[in-house]
From Swiss-Prot:
Domain of life according to the entry: Bacteria
A GO cellular-component term linked to this record: sulfite reductase complex (NADPH)
Reactions mediated catalytically: hydrogen sulfide + 3 NADP(+) + 3 H2O = sulfite + 3 NADPH + 4 H(+)
Any GO BP annotation: sulfate assimilation
InterPro entries found in the cross-reference section: CysI (IPR011786), NiRdtase/SiRdtase_haem-b_fer (IPR005117), Nit/Sulf_reduc_fer-like_dom_sf (IPR036136), NO2/SO3_Rdtase_4Fe4S_dom (IPR006067), NO2/SO3_Rdtase_4Fe4S_prot (IPR045169), NO2/SO3_Rdtase_4Fe4S_sf (IPR045854), NO2/SO3_Rdtase_FeS/sirohaem_BS (IPR006066)
Protein encoded by which gene: cysI
Gene3D superfamilies with a match to the protein in the record: Sulfite Reductase Hemoprotein, domain 1
NCBIfam families for the chain: CysI, PRK13504.1
Function of the molecule: Component of the sulfite reductase complex that catalyzes the 6-electron reduction of sulfite to sulfide. This is one of several activities required for the biosynthesis of L-cysteine from sulfate.
GO molecular function per UniProt: 4 iron, 4 sulfur cluster binding; heme binding; metal ion binding; NADP binding; sulfite reductase (ferredoxin) activity; sulfite reductase (NADPH) activity
Protein name as catalogued: Sulfite reductase [NADPH] hemoprotein beta-component
PROSITE patterns the record matches: NIR_SIR
Binding sites annotated in the UniProt record for siroheme: C483
Source organism (scientific name): Salmonella typhi
Binding site for [4Fe-4S] cluster: C434, C440, C479, C483
Length: 570
């Protein structure tokens, strides 16, 4: 594949302005501390607008009222999104109670948003509450370091495996990888936690003074569940077990879904297999992949800076050989592994030690008290009595983990009383959207606010064609950055403009194939008409057990994407 097209190891040329910003930031300090005291604006100015991302925050505004405020000669209502670092999505009930209180008392929207990267976000934090949120997190053993911008982001880990013992081991590795790849700068502690400035020079032995060329995403995945969507990520450790014990990992590198509309130098790409490594080499290999991307990634063009482009430019074998050289190992051949699904198993599942896990479906991950469904209050009440932990899944759901038999009935009653166990269709369980409007500055079309009613319509189409219990993995993302992971869905909608989407078809249920654009810039009625026709054909013509995405490929409705660098846009 990529070996046919070898390119330079380092891209020469004028560095992007982001590289200047990082270099001049004094290891991510900038003038954030001074900016915090500027009461004339609700936002951060100059480089600080981007630098706060390294501290886990994005500056946003409420786009529903942007025009109204402009007419009143007011600046946009600036507020921050904060994303917590939570490897593997595991959070204690004490931590949950603290974040519940902060959301209620100190955010505009009052909600907790579970993300498909197994963490939570607060939306609508005013500038005066920015420092307090970091201090609140620190007080319960959490932080927001490196959850955005050019670093290794929150490390994912399969959250509901069939073998609980394996989860415990894999989760420990997710934590170790996260800690190992964290930035070493003291900027976070100095600015947010008021820790003293130390008169030593900061060093970043792994990330370097200008950090990574672009965001970098890592997973630890336990087959046969691909719930964390490994092909959306730069670096993936696939757990290999013998007799129920973790012995090593298969490494897959170079996945990523973000594109830019009309820019044919960008494409979604699945991750490539590098080989198998025994457990003891895990951190060395993780570091080697990151430092190779640090040194070879494109720092002249951020649209082509991710690992997937580096891999295609230099060639897979060249990149792999460099990782082996830096880690001091030779990869063994890939060990057999198979994925059979990626949805969460909603409801009760029995684990080891006679403990139970209850997976709750949270539509689009938005935890709020809705009329007749006080989800947020319900989870708070469960957190007050539950002796285990919560786990956030990569499908934006929540697991009440390690429930003893004696507590099962009580927790189930709380969940039912607060609308947390209402029956939903298989289709709704397998549908997901990013946040998009009103808070995301990149949003081109609705996603989270659009999906529930759109799912109703897809459910009606399934019913019409006599397959109401079937499901299609469906995802909506408000812009081509792809946070909703539409580029690994059977039906992927990518926002193009208000009320308009590109429709992608031909992904599969296990998330190992990129869907191709079927129709461009179309409205919701157009999408429904296309799906009505195609789902009707699927219902009549499918083979036994054949998913919708596989059917669209077999029936010749869509050509599969086989080599994205070459054929994604064809």
């Amino acid at each position: 594949m990529s070996e046919k097209y070898p390119g330079p190891l380092v891209v020469e040329g004028k560095l992007s302005d982001a590289e200047r910003m990082k270099l001049e930031s004094n290891y991510l300090r900038g003038t954030i501390a001074e900016d915090l005291n500027d009461g004339l604006t609700g936002g951060f100015k100059g480089d600080n607008f981007l630098l706060i991302r390294f501290h886990g925050m994005y500056q946003q505004d409420d786009r529903d009222i942007r025009a109204e405020r402009a007419a009143q000669k007011l600046e946009p209502r600036h507020a921050m999104l904060l994303r917590c670092r939570l490897p593997g999505g595991v959070i204690t009930t004490t931590q949950w109670q603290a974040i519940d209180k902060f959301a209620a008392d100190n955010t505009i929207y009052g909600s907790i948003r579970l993300t498909n990267r197994q963490t939570f976000q607060f939306h609508g934090i005013l500038k005066k509450n920015v420092k307090p949120v970091h201090q609140m997190l620190h007080s319960v053993g959490l932080d927001a370091l490196a959850t955005a911008n050019d670093m290794n982001r929150n490390v994912l880990c399969t959250s509901n495996p069939y073998e609980s013992e394996l989860h415990a081991e894999a989760y420990e590795w997710a934590k170790k990888i996260s800690e190992h790849l964290l930035p070493r700068t003291r900027a976070y502690a100095e600015i947010w936690l008021d820790q003293e400035k130390v008169a030593t020079t900061d060093e970043e032995p792994i990330l370097g003074q200008t950090y990574l060329p672009r965001k970098f995403k890592t997973t630890v995945v336990i087959p046969p569940q691909n719930d964390i969507d490994l092909h959306a990520n730069d670096m993936n450790f696939v757990a290999i077990a013998e007799n129920g014990k973790l012995v090593g990992f298969n490494l897959l590198v170079g996945g990523g879904l973000s594109i830019e509309h009309g820019n044919k130098k960008t494409y979604a790409r699945t991750a490539s297999e590098f080989g198998y490594l025994p457990l003891e080499h895990t951190l060395a290999v993780a570091e080697a992949v990151v430092t190779t991307q640090r040194d070879w990634g494109n720092r002249t063009d951020r649209k082509n800076a991710k690992t997937k482009y580096t891999l295609e430019r230099v060639g897979l074998e060249t990149f792999k050989a460099e990782v082996e050289r830096r880690a001091g190992i030779t990869f063994e051949p890939i060990r057999p592994y198979e994925f059979t699904g990626r949805g969460d198993r909603i409801g009760w599942v029995k684990g080891i030690d006679d403990k139970w896990h209850l997976t709750l479906f949270i539509e689009n991950g938005r935890i709020l008290d809705y009329p007749g469904r006080p989800l947020k209050t319900g989870l708070l009440e469960i957190a007050k009595i539950h002796q285990g932990e919560f786990r956030i899944t990569a499908n934006q759901n929540l697991i009440i983990a390690s429930v003893p038999e004696s507590q099962k009935a009580k927790i189930e009653k709380l969940a039912r009383d607060h609308g947390l166990m209402n029956a939903v269709s298989a289709q709704r369980e397998n549908s997901m959207a990013c946040v998009s409007f009103p808070t995301c500055p990149l949003a081109m079309a609705e996603a989270e606010r659009f999906l529930p009613s759109f799912t109703d319509k897809v459910e009606a189409i399934l019913e019409k064609h006599g397959i109401p219990d079937e499901h299609i993995v469906m995802r909506v993302t408000g812009c081509p950055n792809g946070c909703g992971r539409a580029m690994l869905a059977e039906i992927g909608l990518v926002g193009k403009a208000p009320g308009r989407y590109n429709l992608h078809l031909g992904g599969n249920r296990i998330g190992s194939r990129i869907p191709r654009m079927y129709q461009e810039n179309i409205t919701e009625p157009d999408i429904q008409a296309s799906l009505d026709e195609l789902i009707g054909r699927w219902a009549k013509e499918r083979e036994a057990g054949e998913g919708f995405g596989d059917f669209t490929v077999r029936a010749g409705i869509i050509r599969p994407v086989l080599d994205p660098a070459r054929d994604f846009w064809e």
